[in-house]
A protein has these predicted regions:
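Structured alpha/beta or helical-core interaction and ligand-binding surfaces enriched in interleaved
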Residues: 1-115, 119-121
Length: 121
């Protein structure tokens, strides 16, 4: 198991521990059997409720630490899972992001087309 919260790791170290292994991710099923993507709209209560239920279904502990970054790894944020859930509009906006578990067991990718996917190593 990898500890991505190690204070000795630089941004480029984190990137090297994650990106080369993205091909190993097993993505959860999405809207149908041909896609791993699901709708990540928070524009109305119904869509937001479906998204939150889907995220809660991933059984991630509220206190679990995650790293959020853009695709260029230029803007890293360290948060607890509960903080992500509490402020989805901040993270699910007009930017591609990766949310990586601090122990590199799972990853979530959001695309600005309001779609998201979740996978595990």
């Amino acid at each position: 198991m990898v500890n991505l919260l190690n204070p000795d790791l630089r941004v480029r170290d984190l990137r090297k521990l994650v990106e080369p292994h993205l091909h190993e991710v097993s993505w959860d099923r999405g809207v149908d059997e041909t896609s791993e993507w699901v709708i990540a709209s928070i524009e109305d209560c119904e869509h937001k409720s479906k998204l939150v239920n889907w995220l809660n279904g991933k059984n991630v502990s509220d206190s679990f630490e995650v790293i959020i970054t853009d695709k260029a790894w230029s803007n890293l944020r360290y948060l607890c899972w509960s903080q992500v859930l509490a402020d989805l509009p901040t993270y699910f906006d007009q930017e591609n992001i990766l949310i990586v578990s601090s122990n590199r067991t799972w990853i979530m990718e959001y695309a600005p087309q309001q779609i998201v996917r979740f996978g595990q190593w």
